[in-house]
């Protein structure tokens, strides 16, 4: 399955060894993870500003993501579908890469449930689906 992992899931995977870390490892092995330059830049910026990572470590983490996962540069959406315009970048990446789902901890995105055939799920909903 082709999946976009939202920035908040990626950050949680890197800063703790919890659910999101396990989810990232699982998806890296079993699925095709798709990212975009916007998601990677947002990830790097959050590590430095919010979590006080040294820039060199944030660059290394971002480089690891770029080397391990597919990277797409989506065109902007024709119309905004999210309250937060940054969330439109997540949707655009998933639609451009023909992903089946977006995994996010963002409370606004799951309210949409699906956009252009892309399901939007929380990490716990993703695990429930995988346990199937």
Q: How would you describe each model-predicted region?
A:
Residues 6-7, 35-36, 105-106, 122-123:
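A secondary-structure boundary/capping signal
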Residues 17, 40-41, 109, 127:
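Alpha-helix N-cap/helix-start and coil->helix boundary motif
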Residues 100-101, 107-132:
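Acidic, PIN/NYN-like endoribonuclease modules and their adjacent C-terminal/linker elements
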